[in-house]
Amino acid sequence: MTNRLILFDFDETYYKHRTNQADIPYLKEMKSLLQNITAKNNVITAILTGSTIESVLQKMSKVNMSYKPQHIFSDLSSKMFTWNNCEYIESDEYKNEVLIEPFLLEDILDILKHVSSKHKVEFIPQRIFRENETLYNFYFYSSGDTHLDKTILEDLSQYSKTRDYTMTFNRCNPLAGDPENAYDINFTPKNAGKLYATKILMNKYGVPKELIIGFGDSGNDEAFLSYLDHAMIMSNSQDEEMKSKFKNTKYPYYKGIYTHVREFIEYENV
């Protein structure tokens, strides 16, 4: 039987930050379905997220997510972890591919300084950065004028390209712990990102696009979802632009994933 792939964004897609008792039956239903199809239907599951592996595992533990996807691509899919012997192990092979070209914080800070001076704006680090990072992320607070925001961010993206760096941005989601009225600014190596991770998995398992379904909720999911034949935006998404571009799930969060994964597996088994 041919392998199939199921790909999930994490925050506010696979994981609901405000999970409550009413959500637990749907969470258990989703878990049971994923366990069954992984064991019986040649299905590979993976999380593609901007969060760190530590953050993902902490949140999964918080709501007792006992099912473990085979792969987690953290830090905007610049790191790959595989479930093996009851723990997630980082892939050195993937790490070497990601860092095949120079990726330096000093270069990124210089890029930001140039655009910051030009537009008289500020880019704020989201955390304390360590050595040899594969993701450098910043916040940019909205000017109150969406058109002006996009002009500044597109300028930053284009200038980054002239410096041989990849920068993406998306509107922040306060439900996922982000600040209000802000944008995520993400710098990753060229060999990284959710689309890159998707193609790596397709090649690794020999899965064609028509046998993949992907779920997301925000702008940083657009590239990989646009690439797939079966792509879903969560109905609980706060991103109206993304909801207008993709098919929306019938239900939010766990119930939505359960419903559409089951439909996808049953359709492919016909």
From Swiss-Prot:
Source organism of the structure: Staphylococcus epidermidis (strain ATCC 12228 / FDA PCI 1200)
Gene Ontology, cellular component aspect: cytosol
Protein name as catalogued: Uncharacterized hydrolase SE_0147
Enzyme nomenclature, EC number: 3.-.-.-
Enzyme class, spelled out: hydrolase
Family stated for the protein in its record: Belongs to the HAD-like hydrolase superfamily.
Keyword DNA repair: no
Keywords: Hydrolase
